[in-house]
Amino acid sequence: MLKFVCHGASETTRECTFDALIVAGWTGRDTAALEHHIEELAKIGVPRPSSVPVFYRTSVNGLTQTARLDVLGPDTSGEVEPVLFAIGDDMWLGVGSDHTDRKAETMGIALSKQLCGKPVGRELWLYADVAGHWDKLVIRSWATIDGKRVLYQQGALGIMRRPEELLELYGSTRLAPGAAMFCGTVGAIGGIRPAARFEMELEDPVLRRRLAHVYEVVTLPVIA
């Protein structure tokens, strides 16, 4: 059960359960840049995606609003993403982290997605309220690495496919009630690396508001 403060025509608090979680990958609009990045990752052993974009189904039990995320081993990292939630008849927008096991990623991306929880924030915006200026929304993240807080990601959603296009490519005209979809991310500044703390933000510069969430990453030992 997740609890959200929903900002629409009025502010309401809702307790929600979900029965489907989709993680959309390779959602950028620039296909040439995507192909270049796919080739770069292939050189370090990350398998080529079966399609672009690609949609991974992962366990809905991974959705969490925790402030502490336990992970197995030192090779995981977060990445900020806009997240769609279908609640009742409406679609809502939140912020989340597609935390991923990077070591497992070389064996299979779907496996790497499944191994880590997916933290999400506690506030949502009605998607209809931001649909008209989706391209101007900005995602950011900060990572605490070796005790230093650094800007880890930053980019406008205009470089990513719109939700309507993602849903069409997924094979649906709308997100089914009870489903959530991570919509993709932007590159990591300085490269992907693990962090002890991950802060994420979705900014709406038009309506002058922000969604945010932060969590600590606790690394559990790998015991043979």
Language model features with spans:
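Catalytic-core "active-site belt" of small-molecule-metabolizing enzymes
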Residues: 1-176, 180, 187-224
